Amino acid sequence: MQIGSGTNTYEWQDSWASIPESESARDGWAHHGVTVTESGQIITYHPGDPTMMVFDPDGTLVRTFPVELSDAHGITLVNEGGQELLWIADNGRKRLPGLGYDYPGGETKGQVLKMDLQGNILARLTRPHLDVYREGMYSPTWVAINEESY
């Protein structure tokens, strides 16, 4: 199957990656970010479990590491002082089977994490203290970084 259009047309490879099997992976919603390291490894989030996955270009799972996230909606890779780091936007909630496009009820815990490639948390940005978020939801979906700032 081809996806995209024009110069951005790609061949869909349905069985490219070996995703660790779990009940949550079969039923989990997956529309999270993907990034590629300087060495060509692909980093993404498990469709059901709070786990980051690192694949080689052939789709072989190289390693995983647990993360304190509901979902890794947006993943941005930066090179800071010669070290590759991840910025991950967690919208604070995860869709569940049987709810269609609705999210489960309850408080959301949106956050942005800055991590190294081993999974160590270097910074955590939580709900900003702004009037708009006092009663509203904080649900970040992507991170933009000004790499000239470091």
Task: Describe each PLM feature range.
Residues 1-15:
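Blade/loop signatures of beta-propeller domains
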Residues 9-11, 29, 108:
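Short, solvent-exposed coil/turn segments
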Residues 10, 49, 58-61, 119, ...:
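Short coil turn/linker residues within repeat-based beta-strand modules
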Residues 14-50:
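Beta-strand-rich domains and repeat architectures in extracellular enzymes and scaffolds
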Residues 14-24, 60-66, 123-125, 129-133:
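A short beta-strand motif characteristic of beta-propeller blades
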Residues 35-50, 56-60, 69-70, 79-83:
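Short, solvent-exposed loop/edge-beta patches enriched in aromatic
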Residues 54-55, 115:
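Hydrophobic/aromatic beta-strand positions that recur at structurally equivalent sites within the blades
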Residues 69-74, 78-150:
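Asp-box/WD-like beta-propeller blade repeats and closely related beta-sheet repeat scaffolds
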